[in-house]
Structure formats: C-alpha cells, structure tokens
C-alpha cells in the first residue's frame, strides 16, 4: 500500500506529470507559464523568500507584544487566514505564487504572537526553539542529501500513519477539552507529556524527509515552475509545525 506525504502540498499526486497535464488543460489561457519547469535552485529561492516574509511578519507582532499593544487579533487572525490560504492552495496549486507569500505573511503574524507569549513566560525560549529547529532541519537535509536516510514506501507509510495519529489525537483532545473538564495527557510537564512532545518532534522531523523527497521528484518530473512556490510553502508549513513543537517541549522542560 502506498502512502503520500501528510502535507497536502507535497503529495505524489500534486507533483505527478498527469496532474500537471490536467492543470495545463484547465488553464488554456496560459496565465501560468507551463513552459518553464520546476528547479531545485528555484524552490530553494522561493523557500528563502517565504522564510524572510514569515520572519518579517513575526517581528511585527513580536514588537507589538513587547510594546504594550494587544496582539490577540493579528495573531489569531493570522492563524485563521493562514489556514484558509493553505486549504485554497491545496486545491489550487497553480495559485501558489500568489497564495504562498500571503500564507507566510499571515502565519508570521501568528508565529510572532505565540513566540512573544512564550518568551514572556520563559525568557530565552524562542532563541533555543529557533536554534533547535534550524539544527534539526540541517541535520535532516544532510542525512537526505547524502542518502543516509532513504525515503522508501515503508518509510512513508510509517511517517504518514504516525502523523495522522497525532493530528487525530490533537483534534479529539481539543474538542473534548472544550466541552468537558478533561485535561489531555500532553498538557502539563509530566514525563508522559514530555515524552509525547519528543515523539511529535521526531515525527515532524521525519516529515522533512518526505518534503525533500517530493520536491526532488517534482524537479525530476519537470513539473511547471509554479510548483516551486507550492513545494516551498509545504516545506515552510512543516518547519512552522516543528518550531511550535519545540516551543512546547522547551516550555515543559522549563517548568521542571
């Protein structure tokens, strides 16, 4: 049985030649130039652009938070709008050149807000979370580049199954805690809670390998150039997830 990446932006179907052909047929007006192909360097450049946009937006809400400005509206609004843009892009990848920068902008507002909240509670936590995320990314990239870790179908199956299990658990826990006094086991700083955070971080990191693999396949299959934005957006989504999980883990360890 074949599994695709949990990230809707980085699924085999999205990067397949057949899917691209269908997109070309739909967009006969040539709004997107399908004659240009996705390249690795182009995807790297797009990822860097999105990262800079995200960091720039994050600095705005960070500055607001530490200067007495209420950040709830831009932070929550950014998260909601960012999610909406993710959903739209998942169904319309050809619009990624426009939606991806918007996602980075609004998600950055959310990241800046939540980072400021954690920093106020645990001074120094943000720089540690950023460092941990960067190191994890570089290690995973190195392991993938030198073929130390190979993305096989079994590897995909395990990572995707674990990711879906985490997403399901988070969703159920959130819904139940909203309507009952139940406290999910991943809350607090118990050993069980810390163990869950470590497990989630490992799975998030393993998703990076799926991201790298799908981007590489997109380049090999010579899909249209707009897929550079699509792939870059998917990679940023995984990095944001990883960063948030590091914030959670470090906050739990700080309480010990």
List each language-model region with its residue ranges.
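A hydrophobic alpha-helical transmembrane-helix feature that marks the membrane cores
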Residues: 1-256
């Amino acid at each position: 049985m074949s599994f695709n990446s949990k990230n809707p932006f980085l699924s085999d179907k999205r990067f397949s030649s057949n899917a691209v052909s269908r997109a070309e047929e739909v967009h006969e007006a040539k709004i997107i130039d399908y004659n240009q192909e996705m390249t690795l360097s182009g995807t790297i450049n797009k990822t860097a652009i999105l990262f800079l946009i995200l960091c720039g937006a994050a600095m705005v809400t960070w500055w607001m938070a530490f200067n007495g400005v209420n950040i709830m509206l831009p932070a929550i609004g950014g998260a909601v709008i960012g999610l909406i843009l993710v959903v739209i892009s998942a169904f319309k990848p050809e619009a990624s050149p426009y939606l991806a920068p918007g996602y980075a902008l609004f998600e950055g507002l959310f990241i800046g807000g939540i980072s400021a909240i954690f920093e106020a509670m645990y001074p120094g936590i943000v720089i540690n979370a950023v460092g941990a995320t960067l190191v994890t990314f570089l290690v995973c990239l190195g392991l993938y580049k030198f073929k130390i870790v190979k993305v096989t179908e079994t590897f995909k199956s395990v990572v995707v199954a674990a990711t879906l299990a985490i997403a399901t658990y988070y969703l159920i826990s959130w819904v139940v805690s909203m309507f009952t006094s139940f406290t999910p086991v991943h809350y607090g700083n118990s050993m069980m809670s810390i163990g869950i955070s470590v497990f989630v971080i490992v799975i998030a990191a393993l998703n990076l390998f799926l991201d790298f693999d799908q981007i590489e396949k997109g380049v090999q299959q010579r899909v249209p150039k707009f897929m550079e934005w699509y792939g870059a957006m998917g990679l940023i989504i995984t990095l944001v997830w990883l960063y948030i999980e590091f914030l959670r883990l470090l906050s739990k360890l700080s309480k010990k």
